């Protein structure tokens, strides 16, 4: 028989840097999970992606055990990294902060594709190009 799920927690945690301080500690403490056990498991599983912000879905079971799934970094983080900018534009329709080539966009698409709601790379490129436009990053050829 499958374990009974009591809570699902969604957090964004830096890879390899989970610690008991907020937001991880309070969220897991309320669910009754051993915080240090989660931190050790998470850090071990994500040490190769150190520094990336990872959306994480933590499933807490009735016996206070847990499992977690990490996803790819948010599209905005990947786009900023590909464009080489620290942040998006405050006025994206007036002030552009960077230009991104279609080849660079396709690299981001290949990274992010498993987490998007499409399996078609061309449609995924359109999704991420729209997100880039909203951040003030111009995409060549789109």
UniProtKB/Swiss-Prot annotation:
Keywords, sorted A to Z: Methylation, Ribonucleoprotein, Ribosomal protein, RNA-binding, rRNA-binding
Source domain of life: Bacteria
Modifications made to the protein after synthesis: One or more lysine residues are methylated.
GO biological process, one term: translation
HAMAP family: Ribosomal_uL11
Record text on subunit structure and interactions: Part of the ribosomal stalk of the 50S ribosomal subunit. Interacts with L10 and the large rRNA to form the base of the stalk. L10 forms an elongated spine to which L12 dimers bind in a sequential fashion forming a multimeric L10(L12)X complex.
Family of this protein: Belongs to the universal ribosomal protein uL11 family.
PANTHER family documented for this protein: 60S RIBOSOMAL PROTEIN L12, LARGE RIBOSOMAL SUBUNIT PROTEIN UL11M
Function, in words: Forms part of the ribosomal stalk which helps the ribosome interact with GTP-bound translation factors.
Protein name: Large ribosomal subunit protein uL11
Species of provenance: Akkermansia muciniphila (strain ATCC BAA-835 / DSM 22959 / JCM 33894 / BCRC 81048 / CCUG 64013 / CIP 107961 / Muc)
Gene that encodes the chain: rplK
């Amino acid at each position: 028989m499958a374990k009974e799920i009591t809570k699902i927690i969604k957090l964004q945690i830096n890879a390899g840097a989970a610690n008991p301080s907020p937001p991880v500690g309070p969220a897991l403490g309320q669910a009754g999970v051993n915080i240090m056990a989660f931190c050790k498991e998470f850090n071990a599983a994500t040490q190769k992606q150190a520094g990336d912000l990872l959306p994480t879905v933590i499933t807490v079971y009735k016996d206070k055990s847990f499992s977690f799934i990490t996803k790819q970094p948010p599209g905005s983080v990947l786009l900023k990294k590909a464009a080489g900018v620290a942040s998006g534009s405050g006025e994206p329709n007036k002030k552009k902060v960077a230009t991104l080539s279609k080849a660079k966009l396709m690299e981001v698409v290949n990274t992010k594709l498993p987490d998007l709601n499409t399996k078609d790379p061309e449609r995924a490129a359109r999704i991420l190009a729209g997100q880039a436009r909203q951040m003030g990053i111009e995409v060549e050829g789109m």
